[in-house]
């Protein structure tokens, strides 16, 4: 039993044993499925815990210049970075801190890819794609809702990809099950698999809550193994956030006044 009186208030308290249990499960999924699973900072960025994470995973994903710096300077490896848009001011620092950079549009890719080439460190570039399918019920949070500007739809993607696009990024889940991922993959492959021979990696984004008690991890592993079998040249990446720290701690507080 934790003695909460020993901690300041308010305070986030993480239980290392519970964190390691989640990390072991995630590493087991990654190893058995033959994929890479990385940490999304937008969900969790308690940097003092990063040495524990590094025992189980190698990389993280960033959505801003500061998260990219956190990846390099505290997590100890360069980030897989995606942002809806980059600026001339931030992009040099983004490049310094990133091994992968995903662009939200062809316009962004065309604007910044020459800088990647000139920088010369071998950053792998990708483009976000929109499968026009998501089971997120709240439209405000649905990245594939009508009129969304997140990613490129299949009709706007050329049959021959521009030189320099090495990967696709697809994110349309939120605390989702493996069965939602299965249905998403059906749409993703139907719309974009014609381009898969031209790319090296496929990032399936976050929202895969594989540490939830009712999550079917065996189905997830089978699903990812099947995807790898159909496209053996592709490096498959998942970047969950909440799954890593699901039910691993609490926020303590105290009542200081009652009117």
Predicted regions and their residues:
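C-terminal active-site-proximal or functional interface alpha/beta core segments in diverse enzymes
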Residues: 176-259
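Residue-level signal for pocket-adjacent positions within structured domains
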Residues: 7-9, 136, 145, 250-253
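Active-site anion-handling motifs in enzyme catalytic cores
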Residues: 18
């Amino acid at each position: 039993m934790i003695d909460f009186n020993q901690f300041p208030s308010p305070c986030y308290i993480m239980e290392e044993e519970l964190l390691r249990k989640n990390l072991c499960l995630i590493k087991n999924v990654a190893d058995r499925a033959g994929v890479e699973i990385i940490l999304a900072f937008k969900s969790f960025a308690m940097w003092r815990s990063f040495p524990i994470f590094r025992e189980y995973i190698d990389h993280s994903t960033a959505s801003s210049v500061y998260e990219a710096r956190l990846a390099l300077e505290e997590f100890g490896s360069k980030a897989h970075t995606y942002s809806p848009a980059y600026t001339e001011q931030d992009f040099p620092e983004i490049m310094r801190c990133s091994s992968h950079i995903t662009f939200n549009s062809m316009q962004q890719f065309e604007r910044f890819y020459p800088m990647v080439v000139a920088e010369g460190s071998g950053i792998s570039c990708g483009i976000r794609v929109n499968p026009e399918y998501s089971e997120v019920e709240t439209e405000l949070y649905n990245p594939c809702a009508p009129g969304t500007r997140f990613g490129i739809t299949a009709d706007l993607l050329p049959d021959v990809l521009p030189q320099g696009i090495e990967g696709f990024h697809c994110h349309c889940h939120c605390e989702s099950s493996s069965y939602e991922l299965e249905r998403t993959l059906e749409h993703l492959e139907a719309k974009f698999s014609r381009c898969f021979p031209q790319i090296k990696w496929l990032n399936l984004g976050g929202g895969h809550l594989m540490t939830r008690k009712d999550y079917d991890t065996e189905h997830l592993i089978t699903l990812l193994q099947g995807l790898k079998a159909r496209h053996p040249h592709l490096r498959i990446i998942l970047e969950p956030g909440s799954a890593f720290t699901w039910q691993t701690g609490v926020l303590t507080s105290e009542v200081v006044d009652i009117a």
